[in-house]
């Protein structure tokens, strides 16, 4: 496209406000706009905000996946869904946040054919996370409301449900990914009287698909999650009224902790995505000028994308096993004290904990026997010998104290 022709066209259409009919090849891709160059401080601030978000999400979700995968005690249905959500959030941080923040700041697509991939991973992983939360809430609801019945999400059923979720999410995202393409735009800067060329990654607006996506990713989950948590709350209230708090068993307390953790996850998701959906539902971009609108959308977009970073933090504070795993991974930080022995004899290794408990119990028994023997044979000399027995699984020495008369 001839640069001089575009500048002349911009002067007539933008500065002189003449009612011009644009050439067919420029229809919809030529715009008048003030200078969109950002100050260095603004660019650095936005870059730091999004890089920190990406780093937190990538590291946090990677650690969650490692904890679940590496430790056998974590291999059950509920945690399979947590692993699935962590993987989905990792994809969002890598393929969506990693490319979209520069596009939203500079209004220029730098990544070529990754447009299709970014469009897909902007929708599919979010749908996976939402559907996983709905499945978990239903599972928790059944466990609380019908505690004597068999758990609906066994290991096998959990894997099947996760596969179905990915199929549904892929089908949901495909229309947007297929329609996405990279197009050129020409912008006339009314301040500098220059024309710049930029590339946009976008898909034609389809109201039907937009409404379907809103229903799947936000409206339907709120209805389902709201109903399941209401039933859970009613069931817990009935249980509390019928049972003295001192008589609650560990199983009931574990259920309560899992429900609270899931509730925090749902609240974080709803709060983070609410401004984003309000912005698009009510077309709030029309209420801002070009400069303020960009910053408003960047803030709203950052809040929405930050939902992929909060779940690992919630797990760490709400679950002892995740907390131990995180402490062990970050033990190199001076303020975190987690020795290898503390990690290996923690709730992540229940077999070792039982072995240690048995050893300590034997030690206490032999110690009491020794005290009794000393009292009975105070006039005799005793020889105390340290014997060692080998654990048949790990061959770790367990020392037992025994005594005999000399």
UniProtKB/Swiss-Prot annotation:
Q: What is its main location?
A: membrane
TM helices/strands, residue ranges = 48-68, 77-97, 116-136, 159-179, 205-225, 262-282, 298-318
Ranges of the Cytoplasmic topological domain: 69-76, 137-158, 226-261, 319-406
Q: Does the keyword Cell membrane apply?
A: yes
* Positions on the Extracellular side per record topology: 1-47, 98-115, 180-204, 283-297
Q: Which domain of life is it from?
A: Eukaryota
List the keywords (alphabetical). Answer: Cell membrane, G-protein coupled receptor, Membrane, Receptor, Transducer, Transmembrane, Transmembrane helix
InterPro entries xrefs: GPCR_Rhodpsn (IPR000276), GPCR_Rhodpsn_7TM (IPR017452), Neurokn_rcpt (IPR001681)
UniProt membrane topology term: Multi-pass membrane protein
Q: Gene Ontology terms, cellular component aspect?
A: plasma membrane
Function, please?
Not known. Putative receptor.
Question: What family classification does the UniProt entry report for this protein?
Answer: Belongs to the G-protein coupled receptor 1 family.
Q: What is this protein called?
A: Probable G-protein coupled receptor tkr-1
């Amino acid at each position: 496209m001839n640069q001089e022709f575009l500048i002349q066209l911009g002067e007539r259409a933008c500065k002189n406000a003449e009612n011009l009919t644009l050439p067919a090849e420029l229809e919809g891709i030529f715009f008048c706009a003030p200078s969109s160059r950002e100050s260095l401080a603004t660019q650095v601030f936005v870059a730091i905000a999004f890089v920190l978000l990406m780093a937190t999400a990538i590291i946090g979700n990677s650690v969650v996946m490692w904890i679940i995968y590496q430790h056998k005690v974590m291999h059950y249905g509920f945690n399979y869904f947590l692993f699935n959500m962590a993987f989905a959030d990792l994809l969002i941080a890598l393929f969506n946040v990693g490319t979209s923040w520069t596009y939203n700041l500079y209004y220029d697509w730098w990544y070529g054919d990754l447009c299709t991939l970014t469009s897909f991973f902007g929708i599919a992983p979010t749908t996976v996370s939402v559907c996983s939360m709905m499945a978990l809430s239903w599972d928790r609801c059944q466990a609380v409301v019908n505690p004597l019945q068999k758990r609906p999400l066994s290991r096998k059923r959990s894997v099947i449900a996760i596969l179905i979720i990915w199929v549904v999410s892929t089908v949901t995202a495909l229309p947007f990914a297929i329609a996405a393409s990279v197009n050129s735009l020409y912008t006339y800067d009314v301040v500098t009287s220059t024309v710049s060329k930029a590339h946009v990654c976008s898909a034609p607006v389809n109201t039907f698909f937009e409404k379907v996506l809103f229903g799947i990713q936000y409206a339907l989950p709120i209805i389902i999650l709201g109903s399941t948590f209401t039933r859970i709350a009613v069931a817990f209230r009935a249980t509390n009224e019928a049972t003295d708090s001192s008589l609650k068993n560990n199983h009931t307390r574990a259920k309560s902790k899992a429900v609270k953790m899931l509730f925090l996850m749902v609240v974080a998701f709803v709060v983070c995505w609410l401004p984003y959906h309000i912005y698009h539902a009510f077309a709030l971009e029309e209420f801002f000028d070009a400069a303020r609108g960009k910053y408003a959308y960047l803030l709203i977009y950052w809040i929405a994308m930050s939902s992929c970073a909060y779940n690992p933090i919630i797990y760490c504070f709400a679950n002892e096993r995740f907390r131990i795993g995180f402490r062990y991974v970050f033990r190199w930080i001076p303020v975190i004290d987690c020795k290898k022995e503390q990690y290996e004899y923690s709730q992540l290794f229940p077999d070792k904990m039982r072995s240690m408990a048995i050893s300590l119990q034997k030690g206490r028994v032999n110690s009491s026997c020794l005290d009794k023997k000393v009292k009975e044979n105070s006039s005799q000399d005793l020889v105390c010998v340290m014997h060692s027995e080998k654990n048949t699984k790990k061959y770790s020495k367990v020392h037992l104290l025994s005594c005999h008369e000399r």
